[in-house]
């Protein structure tokens, strides 16, 4: 067996998580549409969002490229969460997610249409609370909620 050094996943480089170049993103989404795609789920939840996260860019991209973009709410793996998010109670997490669904993300008018929770194994305390909160959110809003507990290295972000 050979061990290769220097190989990383795209999410390991913080810059790969930036959604701050709408023109470049429109071009990429147009490729997706030409290949037959019609809807993208943008699941940059708490722990994956950075200061450059701008949900209004998603509106611009959706309109320009002619695809649906569903923004997600939720909490990512505990190791990625800011300190204050790690300390939230189940109810505080639920209230935050309901707010993003009913009122919008980060002061924008972009409302979330899905709940995504990052899970590692064994579940960290904040991940367990986030899963519990997601059940409250789904019960209150009817939004889709999910997590893939079989994925430890989230290659689905590639």
Each model region followed by its residue ranges:
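Conserved beta-strand edge residues that scaffold enzyme active sites
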Residues: 46-47, 76, 152
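Glycine-rich phosphate-binding "P-loop"
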Residues: 11-19, 117-122, 147-149
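Structural motif
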Residues: 43, 72, 146-150
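Glycine- and Gly-Pro-enriched alpha-helical subdomains that act as flexible
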Residues: 148-158
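Active-site gating/metal-coordination segments in enzymes
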Residues: 39, 60-63, 68-144
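Generic recognition of short, well-ordered alpha-helical segments
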Residues: 53-56, 129, 157
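Alpha-helical scaffold segments that flank or form the walls of functional sites
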Residues: 2-67, 92-110
